[in-house]
């Protein structure tokens, strides 16, 4: 009876812890006591994990990374009171000591007038307090810093030797006098809003304290400091200047809010710009006349140094690259094993579907179910979840329902919905109250899934085995409603397959991340910065490289000469061929002309006898006519005929002479 009462108490306590959010210290102590009692009575890993999930309190998320890690350095926003990690927003713990008021980016976007305010360093405060005390103790020096012309010298000496006031009113006067000396940052000008450049000497100096960036000087503050310095220079008289060296205590002037600019003595004076092909003067405290010249020189150096570094990298094999490639091969082999395991799980799920379909088509075996019911003994046991005494026949059904009841008290959610190829294994039920998606397995989710309704004619269908592991090939044909031995066997089998799938997908995700890291290491190992900044000069390799380069140059020169000689020979051959072509063309033209002349001669030879016959006939006719005409007419006609004959004979002679010259 006492044990049962203890079990009832523990059950009531666990239900209360699952429903109520416990925040006080007393309730937390009660939770610890309850957890210890349950762990003592039920020392099981399933019970421990379930209690841990129920009693676990959600951690508060901070910073832009939305993590609950509070072990690192954090800084709070004075506007929205949100805490941020220093490494997430780029502020170190040393820098945070100099910040008086910090505002995050979200507050600055909502109200652009809000700006981060920095406090003065201890050295600056001491210098400012000394300057303020001396200015107050000086004769006739008001808050503006100007001294009257009629002030006596004796009063000045006595006032300098007087001790500084120690009362609260004097301290207030000192603080009020110190404020106009130092001046306040306006918070609205460009210098106040601009962040640190991280490039100037003020940003790089880390000795003693961090001075302010030269680009973050306040315009209003600089103007007030300039006015005060001009007033202090014009105010004191010559007598005061003579009396000043007699005082032993050296007075320190007020330090400006912005740090002093460090001047490099090597960069003083007029210097020529270091840029390539640039004859201009360099800027003050710089080596270049403009940023463009600096970029040009940097690119030129890169083009000069980088090719040699690439040759060095390609000559010597990298041991780290070989090891990363081996790791990559190993990771890919593991990925192939995971894919094979996922394919096997798909086959198992298909086989399970086939077994369920076969059970649906089969009929109930009433005789076998009665025999198994008679064989059950009447033993009792205790539930591992709630602790109640239950019958061994209904133990599996009771434990399943009890587990679902306690499982529904805890929530497992995420703000992102699962995106998977194929069948989704998770529940992904959206809870509008918590704005999360349920991340339980869909088969085992007790809140958002219900078991299908079982009819009287449904068969159990659970595969039967011998000695737990040896399947017989048969299945249970008892009614599904009355079969307590194989209660929810299909649900458990599907949950096992889905759980193994989740495990394999997580393993695949881990392997993909490892592959990404290895690939990034391979690509970043021979990048521009790595090759330019780090190099190992191997003399043996470089000597061999120089020798190879010289041999390559000699071979290249020989090849160039060979090509030039071949080109010269080719041009000569082309010229000779062109000359031969011209000669052949001329010979062909001469032959054509000779053939034409021969043809003309043959034609002329053929035409000459015909012409002679015609002439003879004409002469005979003319003679006949002359015989008929008078004698003087005959003489004239004879003369004309002779002239015509002479004209006809002249072109024949010229043609013959021309042909003789040609031949």
UniProtKB/Swiss-Prot annotation:
SUPFAM superfamilies (alphabetical): FYVE/PHD zinc finger
Residues reported to bind Zn(2+) 1: 186, 189, 192, 218
Any GO molecular function: methylated histone binding
Disulfide bridges in this chain: none
Localization terms from the record: Nucleus
Zinc fingers classed as CXXC-type: ranges: 175-219
Start and end residues of each stretch annotated as Disordered: 134-183, 230-254
PANTHER family: CXXC-TYPE ZINC FINGER PROTEIN 1
Protein name: CXXC-type zinc finger protein 1
Biological source species: Drosophila melanogaster
Organism lineage: Eukaryota, Metazoa, Ecdysozoa, Arthropoda, Hexapoda
């Amino acid at each position: 009876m006492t044990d049962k009462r203890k079990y009832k108490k523990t059950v009531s306590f666990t239900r209360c812890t699952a429903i109520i959010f416990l925040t006080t210290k007393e309730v937390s102590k009660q939770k610890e006591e309850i957890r210890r009692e349950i762990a003592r009575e039920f020392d099981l890993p399933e019970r421990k994990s379930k209690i841990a999930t129920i009693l676990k309190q959600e951690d508060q998320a901070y910073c832009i990374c939305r993590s609950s890690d509070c072990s690192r350095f954090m800084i709070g926003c004075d506007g929205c009171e949100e805490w941020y990690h220093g490494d997430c927003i780029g502020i170190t713990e040393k820098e945070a000591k100099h910040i008086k008021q910090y505002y995050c980016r979200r507050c600055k976007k909502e109200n652009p007038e809000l700006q981060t305010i920095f406090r003065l360093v201890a050295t600056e405060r001491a210098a400012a307090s000394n300057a303020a005390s001396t200015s107050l103790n000086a004769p006739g020096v008001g808050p503006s810093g100007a001294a009257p012309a009629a002030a006596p010298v004796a009063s000045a000496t006595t006032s300098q030797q007087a001790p500084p006031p120690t009362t609260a009113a004097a301290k207030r006067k000192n603080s009020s006098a110190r404020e106009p000396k130092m001046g306040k940052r306006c918070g609205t000008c460009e210098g106040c809003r601009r962040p640190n450049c991280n490039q100037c000497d003020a940003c790089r100096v880390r000795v003693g304290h961090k001075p302010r960036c030269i680009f973050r000087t306040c315009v209003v503050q600089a103007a007030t400091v300039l006015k005060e310095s001009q007033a202090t220079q014009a105010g004191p008289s010559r007598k005061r200047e003579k009396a000043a060296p007699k005082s032993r205590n050296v007075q320190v002037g007020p330090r400006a809010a912005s740090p002093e600019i460090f001047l490099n003595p090597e960069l003083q004076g007029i210097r020529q710009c270091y840029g390539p092909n640039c004859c201009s003067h360099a800027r003050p405290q710089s080596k270049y006349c403009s940023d463009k010249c600096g970029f040009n020189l940097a690119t030129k150096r890169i083009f000069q140094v980088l090719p040699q570094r690439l040759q060095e990298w390609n000559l010597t094999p990298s041991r780290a690259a070989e090891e990363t490639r081996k790791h990559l091969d190993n990771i890919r082999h593991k990925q192939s094993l995971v894919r094979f395991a996922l394919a096997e799980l798909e086959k198992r799920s298909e086989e399970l579907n086939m077994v369920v379909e076969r059970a649906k088509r089969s009929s109930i075996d009433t005789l076998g179910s009665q025999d198994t019911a008679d064989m059950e003994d009447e033993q009792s046991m205790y539930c591992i979840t709630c602790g109640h005494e239950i019958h061994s026949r209904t133990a599996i059904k009771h434990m399943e329902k009890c587990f679902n009841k306690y499982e529904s008290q805890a929530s497992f959610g995420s703000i992102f919905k699962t995106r998977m190829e194929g069948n989704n294994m998770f529940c992904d039920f959206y809870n509008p109250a918590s704005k999360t998606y349920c991340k339980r397995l869909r088969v085992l989710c007790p809140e958002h899934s219900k078991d299908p309704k079982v009819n009287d004619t449904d068969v159990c269908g659970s595969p039967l085995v011998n000695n737990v592991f040896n399947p017989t090939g048969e299945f249970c044909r008892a009614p599904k409603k009355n079969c307590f031995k194989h209660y929810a066997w299909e649900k458990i089998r599907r949950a096992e397959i889905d759980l193994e799938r989740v495990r394999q997908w997580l393993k695949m995700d881990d392997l993909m991340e490892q592959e990404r890291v290895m690939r990034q290491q391979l690509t970043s190992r021979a990048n521009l910065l790595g090759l330019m900044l780090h190099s190992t000069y191997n003399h043996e390799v470089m000597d061999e490289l120089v020798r190879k380069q010289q041999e390559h140059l000699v071979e290249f020169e020989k090849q160039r000469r060979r090509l030039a000689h071949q080109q010269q020979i080719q041009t000569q051959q082309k010229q000779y061929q062109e000359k031969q072509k011209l000669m052949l063309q001329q010979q062909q033209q001469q032959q054509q002309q000779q053939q034409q002349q021969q043809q003309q001669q043959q034609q002329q030879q053929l035409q000459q006898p015909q012409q002679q016959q015609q002439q003879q006939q004409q002469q005979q006719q003319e003679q006949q006519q002359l015989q008929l005409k008078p004698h003087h007419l005959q003489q004239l006609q004879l003369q004309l005929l002779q002239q015509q004959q002479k004209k006809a004979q002249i072109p024949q002679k010229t043609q013959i002479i021309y042909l003789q010259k040609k031949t």
